[in-house]
């Protein structure tokens, strides 16, 4: 009986860790090198990018904003994502941004192995 109890506990611990790993999300930031309003960014980038991530079951958009200079001009737009698999998500995000016409200087940023990784879109 002790053997089965130990075996049961081992399986319970294994499945608890497996479920926890499945729920892991990774933050990713996209910097779009374009002066674009929040509404226009949503239409041009956010909505299609969200659909691509959802279709691939890789994550979602969780926020965004614009960087504004002292004169009040938008310098660049940002999109915040949470993805479930960095290896699969980054190529999907990059290709979608290329397809959507993200300009040169746009980047995808995330952390891996304790280091910041910056991937140019173009």
List each language-model region with its residue ranges.
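Long, contiguous binding/interaction regions
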Residues: 22-80, 84-122
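Bacterial N-terminal signal peptides
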Residues: 8-16
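Bacterial N-terminal signal peptides that target proteins for export
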Residues: 1-8
């Amino acid at each position: 009986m002790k053997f089965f109890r130990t075996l049961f506990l081992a399986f319970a611990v294994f499945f608890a860790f497996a479920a926890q790993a499945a729920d892991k999300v990774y933050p990713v930031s996209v910097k779009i090198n374009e002066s674009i309003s929040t509404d226009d960014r949503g239409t041009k980038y956010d909505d299609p990018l969200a659909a691509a991530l959802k279709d691939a079951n890789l994550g979602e958009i969780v926020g965004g904003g614009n960087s504004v200079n002292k004169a009040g001009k938008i310098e660049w737009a940002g999109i915040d994502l949470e993805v479930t698999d960095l290896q699969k998500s980054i190529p999907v995000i990059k290709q979608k941004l290329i397809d959507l016409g993200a300009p040169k200087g746009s980047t995808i940023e995330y952390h891996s192995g304790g280091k910041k990784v910056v991937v140019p879109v173009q």
